[in-house]
Amino acid sequence: FITESNSAMASPVVAVLKPQGRGVRVCVNYQYVNKYTLPDQTPLTDISEIIQRVGQANFISLFDAKSGYHQCMIVPEDRWKTAFCCDAEMYEWVRCPFGLRGSGCTFVRAIRKILHKVRDCTESYVDDMAVHTVGPWQKHLSDMRRFLEVIKASGFTLNLSKCTFGQSEMKFVGHVIGSGKRRADPDKVDSIKALRVPETKKQVRQLLGLFGHFRDYIVNYALHAKPLTDLTGKRVPNRVPWGEREQNS
């Protein structure tokens, strides 16, 4: 994934603790590089459209791209920009690293290009890919075979431990979908219940973003969310007041 470098610049390496004490993740801080990188405006597919298409399927199989962004190669003339120092040596990335401003969009475009030939039976959201079939089991096997053939031809690899095959209902992009039905993922709902009370406008906006993910399951969502939406108004101080009205919403 990396090679030795003689670049005229290098970004610093930082260590980040993983959640639940699962160790340390070593990352490169590309803050300076990102500052001078033009933004990539590649949009993500609308989740509601994905749910609508995949949710009608009789059979669904999910696939996870192994190592995510690392599957995308960096053109040789740009690799020097990714240089970093570690253990008194300098290295640069051969494959796309995490942390670069354009890594996510580059990966999304690559996945879409790969799946273009099987777009009639596949959907993707970042590194999650679904093969969905409306019809009998044999047709789903045929759809999976077509999917795996284009993945193999692309050179991309899959994380087998995170793949699930031939289910009539499964979790995908925060929802449980299949056989024409859908509902909120219970694990996602539980994680929202465990969130701390927001203290600033920014935290309220983040909370509303999470709640909005499930607005289709809440009758009169806008009415219920209004006390929180009001906290984002210009006349409300940055340190937001939180009372019974907000808690009950």
Question: Which residues fall in each region the model found?
Answer:
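Retroelement reverse transcriptase polymerase core
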Residues: F1-S249
